[in-house]
């Protein structure tokens, strides 16, 4: 049996900061730029999911730049300490909220007769109350090409996070050991995690599977044998 308590991020030991940049494209899709790095843990999927949920659009309409360039990418301190969903995700959500508000503010200039409080964004449409007013694609095209009311809609944030989340859990493993042969057989494993709200349950489950595999490797002193030739 093994128990764990795991903290997300490194605050207050060190700095936790992340940037995000969003722009509304001409076809109504959005472009997301980050300094955070996708290294196989599913970060890009979660960030795209957060933008899509905030803007009430399809994930297919969120184009994320997965190759970072420190000359132009928003600043981010890196991929470590299981921080990206929590720290960079905070920046992504805030950035998407700003872009959403800018979209609705621009929609108001196209629909002067509608009360701003009645405007909402979902299903790739601007709604006035319960009626579709203008599609997001049409609004985006107008924002780029209007001769009298052009305003390319973008948002950018830099978010410092001064709090952490704590995950806890335990793992039970039943093993069979042949002492004479040194052979180990894993009969049964049970993992129990209290992870809080899961942004993407399938990705979280896969990380548990990965951690379980690593734990088995540590337990039997697994090593990678290299051929120097």
Briefly describe each language-model feature range.
Residues 1-229:
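Cofactor-binding beta-sheet edge motifs in enzyme active sites
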């Amino acid at each position: 049996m093994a128990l764990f308590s795991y903290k997300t991020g490194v605050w207050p030991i060190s700095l936790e900061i992340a940037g995000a940049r969003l722009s509304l494209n001409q076809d109504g899709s959005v472009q997301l730029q980050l300094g955070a790095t996708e290294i196989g843990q599913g970060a890009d999927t979660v960030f795209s999911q957060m933008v899509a949920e905030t803007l009430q659009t399809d994930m297919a309409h969120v184009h994320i730049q997965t190759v970072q360039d420190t000359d132009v990418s928003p600043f981010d301190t890196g991929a470590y300490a299981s921080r990206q969903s929590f720290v960079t995700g905070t920046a992504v959500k805030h950035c998407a909220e700003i872009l959403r508000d800018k979209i609705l503010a621009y929609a108001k200039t196209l629909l002067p007769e509608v009360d701003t409080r009645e405007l909402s964004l979902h299903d790739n449409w601007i709604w006035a109350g319960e009626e579709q007013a203008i599609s997001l694609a049409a609004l985006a095209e107008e924002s780029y090409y209007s001769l009298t009311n052009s305003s390319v809609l973008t948002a950018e944030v830099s978010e410092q996070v001064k709090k952490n989340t704590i995950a806890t859990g335990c793992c039970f493993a039943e093993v069979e050991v042949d002492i004479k042969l040194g052979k180990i057989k894993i009969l049964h494993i049970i993992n129990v995690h209290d992870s809080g709200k899961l942004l993407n349950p399938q990705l979280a489950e896969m990380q548990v599977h990965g951690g379980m595999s690593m734990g088995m490797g540590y337990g039997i002193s697994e090593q990678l044998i290299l051929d120097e030739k």
